[in-house]
Amino acid sequence: ASDGKILFIWASGNLLILIGDIEVLLVYGSLMHKDEERVIELEFLRATENAALHSSHWMGRGDKEAADYAACDAIRGMFDLMDIRGEIVIGEGIKDEAPGLFIGEKVGTWAEGSPRFDVALDPVDGTTNVSKGMPNSISCIAAAIPEEGEDCALQEIPAFYMNKLAYPEVVRQAWIKDPSLPISIDAPISEVIKVSAKLLGKNVRDVTVMVLDRPRNEFIIEQVRSLGSKLRMIADGDITAAMAPSLSSTDVDLYAGIGGAPEAVLSAAGQRCLGGGQQA
């Protein structure tokens, strides 16, 4: 993308790239030799980058299924060349009526001696955004090697939707030191905002909360407005939104509300890389 800006964030082999309005996130963890890790790391990166670039051809063309199909096809094509034994544990499914990359699908060459990976992915989170030519779509992969003696490193979430709360590193660290703080998905969002405001050194009215614009999140929207905090509502793009509190390029302090369950796993992996926290 000649007109796209590229942002690299490295943290123990984790890489986030922004290409124009399509983001590519790679979350990767292993105990392999550094050289081997580096090669496979870049192959995962190329898979997500390829998906983002192919789906971007459908920006603003009103066909979200075509954008998703292009991304799936691009990722699968890259997986076919990767010397790994991969299995998709979180992928496309019934909820999306997606064209491929389903849970349980085997990816990679599965050559003898190649590393075993559990793979969680979303070829495009925010296909509606792509179809409308809007920002905040993301193509991402989280991959992990199971520990010795363990059957899996990532697990399927047996739900379509989850309640989520995401926050920046300073809030996460404070909650770790004092678990009694009302920083919880079970606490009223008004209390979470008040505590977060103190930790961030802000007035309650200056705290920005991002929420997915859905009727199921109306109770959160009402609390944020009643408290007088800033509210930023989004139509789609659950993964990007949940990671926003940990990205210095945004002014989002908290993300709250009910969104996709598979997306919760991917955004949690991203938050771990970025230092923030997420509950779901």
Question: Where are the predicted features?
Answer:
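N-terminal hydrophobic or amphipathic helices/low-complexity stretches enriched
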Residues: 32-51
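Flexible, acidic active-site loops/lids enriched in D/E/S/T/G that coordinate Mg2+ and/or position polar
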Residues: 68-149, 155
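Short glycine/serine/threonine-rich phosphate/pyrophosphate-binding segments
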Residues: 123-132, 136-140, 218-219, 239-243, ...
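Short acidic loop-to-helix transition motifs that present clustered carboxylates
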Residues: 94-97, 216, 235-242
